[in-house]
Amino acid sequence: MRFFALFIYRPVATILIAAAITLCGILGFRLLPVAPLPQVDFPVIMVSASLPGASPETMASSVATPLERSLGRIAGVNEMTSSSSLGSTRIILEFNFDRDINGAARDVQAAINAAQSLLPGGMPSRPTYRKANPSDAPIMILTLTSESWSQGKLYDFASTQLAQTIAQIDGVGDVDVGGSSLPAVRVGLNPQALFNQGVSLDEVREAIDSANVRRPQGAIEDSVHRWQIQTNDELKTAAEYQPLIIHYNNGAAVRLGDVASVTDSVQDVRNAGMTNAKPAILLMIRKLPEANIIQTVDGIRAKLPELRAMIPAAIDLQIAQDRSPTIRASLQEVEETLAISVALVILVVFLFLRSGRATLIPAVAVPVSLIGTFAAMYLCGFSLNNLSLMALTIATGFVVDDAIVVLENIARHLEAGMKPLQAALQGTREVGFTVISMSLSLVAVFLPLLLMGGLPGRLLREFAVTLSVAIGISLVVSLTLTPMMCGWMLKSSKPRTQPRKRGVGRLLVALQQGYGTSLKWVLNHTRLVGVVFLGTVALNIWLYIAIPKTFFPEQDTGVLMGGIQADQSISFQAMRGKLQDFMKIIRDDPAVNNVTGFTGGSRVNSGMMFITLKPRGERKETAQQIIDRLRVKLAKEPGARLFLMAVQDIRVGGRQANASYQYTLLSDSLAALREWEPKIRKALSALPQLADVNSDQQDNGAEMNLIYDRDTMSRLGIDVQAANSLLNNAFGQRQISTIYQPMNQYKVVMEVDPRYSQDISALEKMFVINRDGKAIPLSYFAQWRPANAPLSVNHQGLSAASTIAFNLPTGTSLSQATEAINRTMTQLGVPSTVRGSFSGTAQVFQQTMNSQLILIVAAIATVYIVLGILYESYVHPLTILSTLPSAGVGALLALELFNAPFSLIALIGIMLLIGIVKKNAIMMVDFALEAQRSGGLTPAQAIFQACLLRFRPIMMTTLAALFGALPLVLSGGDGSELRQPLGITIVGGLVMSQLLTLYTTPVVYLFFDRLRLRFSRKNSKPVVEI
């Protein structure tokens, strides 16, 4: 009593405390960062190594395996995958959440150093690492185009100056430059001219390497001067290399230009980048795992004027893709939804109370509670994101509940003629324990979420803490500010002998009278109500098993990403044509705003595309509907497939796959994996529950297999090393020398001129100089035949791996897809040597599925414990928790009605319902117990009176929560696919719960009261018919 009086009789102090809470919240709001979702990125580091010309199998065995053995010893590695292709290896290390990315990077560098001695010679550089996830979509893509600059020159400018500057911006993890390669001097050899002059390819290579050196020459000095020695030992341009003497034939000099075409070109001619049908250089910017995407993008945009100032006038720099506008639009939608929810909740209060002064009290309590939460969010290191703002939107219905319960009880005393301050004190004292019970039991629901581990735990923690803090502040406000305002703002009135006869009052009286009549009937037919209650429990179980499930709702971020997979024997020229064809099809779609793409590099038959859609308000279709429409058009392109997927704010794993979900096959036997992967992929492709099925195992690349006759080689004076060196020199784009420039280093690349290597007959023109100086044709000691070869070799851990990626057709849930895959694997009879498991998002989904029921049971158990402690009873908490089955049925039925799968967002809704619907029972049970203790009523009379007396606040709190959640259901625009499942779950659960628990709770109360008396061996009074 004294605690409540302290605030009621000291209004100035109470107002200033509320103002302080509000001011702290406003300050916290201004300091909070903005993000699409809570920070849930796994720390990921990518290690890259190259050996130009090496086959995928060579890269896997000689480069990937030594690095993997060394990197696998690092502590905290969650998953290690690698992919080796022509001339390159990439290893992805995914660490545990609690691993510091900088500490992990130091360990990675130490592991690379330890493996250095085991790596093959001839690598142009040491392996490097980057602190970024290559499977993440770029947060921003910049394009460089020019009418006068070559692609190589543009690439050089982009990588040397722009990428270096952008990489220094806070939050940037990686700037990947694509579309071409660095400038280089290319030496295109003429095999016939070399044969005529008797010059070997090794001789050419050694002559070039010896002619271009960079060594210190020292200095000369006397007593007065010092002269630095400088020579023309470096060759920098093609024109300087052409007259280079590489051989003497009968005393005549043979110059490089006599046997080769020497041009200023690029290191790798098999690269192409485009933006909207124009050749372009792409700068694909990815953030650090722990970085905030909005702050990083803002930092890049702030740097753009400086970047444009340093760019020559001939270059056009444009933003081709930016993830931030849709994120900002989504958050703006949530903020508008929050404002609408607050307005609707206050409207509900006004309709019930029909008093401007009375409505002003919760109208003040709600913003104080919500705004004050921002201060706690800032102190906890949270951000303004979709989930935290949705928590505040839902909190509007919660925080007003406490104020409504206190306000309604005080108003009841005022209507009975009590003085305002006395009514405030008496009313608050009566419901103080009820309000505390409701709030603490609601917060208890979220305790299991706070203890939940893994990605789901990280994702839900911010939501749970934000909502819990809002409820806590609301509890304080409702027991301090609300009674004070009631005592000083509301006026007492004479007791009314007749109920109100106008508007909502008349409707409420009619509802209350109807409820009283129906409740009498129910209390006289308890067995029927018991059957209904047991039926809702059984229906819950059936609906939960039957409802389709997924991990996270598919988002429409306005950005699509696509992977091109062409015939494995396709040439680069043909692949570039496929890229152009696909880009034209997509660019012609009316919903597409911009499209960029690139192909080439180590995987000639693949490419990537990034599509920016028009803003949500300018298109009618969702991202998935656009993908479905484009899939039909893209399927008509022969010889290649483009797999599109909508970019998501959550992407798990480091695999770069051509679809949203992955199923990985592992085996210690590469032969077994290559045998079974095509069978499994074919079977999965036939499943209607899957779409866009594809695999990263590509074993049908065209290969020319050379078989050496070692006896003949020995007789001719040729060794295998010389033969292999010939092939590398001729066809491996071999980097044979380095050109040093002030801003960068460039390579001299040697190969047979493409004009002389158009087909397999080029091998017949190759020759080796033997130990006697004679030119021996390759055909003298080698035979060749066509064969199939892998275009890539993949590992997970130290096992051979193949990942089958898939998307979901419209209307199919992830649970249906995973069940179909597991069923197919069983039917195929896959041997134990080949192991299959879901990876990435699908793996997290399965882990979440296994813990969902445990989480729900843990929440119910926690609430039971808290209520048991508060009521000092084993029985009354069960009565209160009996409200849950009807809410579960309503939520699951609503999801089915709206064709929405049960996702992590829907799980949040179920957890919230556990906290919401029990409030009705708490208000009933509290007043029934008080009536039994102080009024001497029987249990039946007490619960009947409690139900009628608390009917108005129950209706108010339920409608407030319902109208607070309703904007989530009705919201459209950006991010609505995240908000709607939460709103559907809560609204469905509240409607069903309100219809049933008003009747089932009294029946359960009486049942447990009889049970309690029976176990205590006391004679219970007979149930009095009402």
Curated annotation (Swiss-Prot):
The chain crosses the membrane at residues 15-35, 333-353, 360-380, 387-407, 431-451, 463-483, 528-548, 853-873, 897-917, 953-973, 984-1004. It is a multi-pass membrane protein. InterPro entries: AcrB_DN_DC_subdom, Acrflvin-R, Multidrug-R_MdtC. Disulfide bonds: none annotated. Its main location: membrane. It is found in: Cell inner membrane. It holds the Pfam family ACR_tran. GO terms for cellular component: plasma membrane. Keywords: Cell inner membrane, Cell membrane, Membrane, Transmembrane, Transmembrane helix, Transport. It comes from the Bacteria. The keyword Transmembrane helix applies. GO terms for molecular function: xenobiotic transmembrane transporter activity. Part of a tripartite efflux system composed of MdtA, MdtB and MdtC. MdtC forms a heteromultimer with MdtB. This is Multidrug resistance protein MdtC.
